[in-house]
A protein has these predicted regions:
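Domain-level signature for proteins that mediate thiol-based redox and metal-cofactor handling
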Residues: 1-127
Length: 127
């Protein structure tokens, strides 16, 4: 069902966990199967310096989230907003049928994280 690359990532997913003090946290929930994806980002001077994830979801979502966090390091906030999920497919290969929703969750969770970042930044500037 899963290709070799996905199986390899599932055997040792990267960046699983929570970043204490993350200044950008984004969450997305699937209407299709109730999967939940949460990204924790540490952004310094507008650039992602650390990224982790937690999920209540299946194997495909774990692999997609793991690859995404690796791809985010070194990107600017604007680059996160413009993130193309085809980059994930380039790393993983094609996802099995009915797993494409995982890419949509990534997009939603990243937008949510950027919104959270800007809210926290605005609050910080007002203090």
């Amino acid at each position: 069902m899963y290709n070799e690359k996905i199986v390899e990532i599932l055997q040792n997913p990267k960046n699983v966990g929570i970043i204490k003090g993350a200044n950008a946290v984004g969450k997305a929930c699937s209407d299709v199967c109730s999967d939940i994806l949460k990204f924790y980002l540490m952004i310094d001077d507008g650039v992602v310096i650390e990224a982790k994830f937690k999920t209540f979801g299946g194997s495909a979502l774990i692999a997609v989230a793991s690859v995404t966090t690796s791809l985010l390091i070194g990107r600017t906030v604007d680059e996160i907003l413009a993130f193309d999920t085809n980059e994930i497919i380039q790393v993983l290969g094609n996802l099995p049928n009915k797993k494409g929703y995982c890419l949509g969750l990534v997009e939603q969770a990243l937008r949510s994280a950027v919104e959270d970042y800007y809210k926290k930044l605005e609050k910080e500037q007002q203090e």
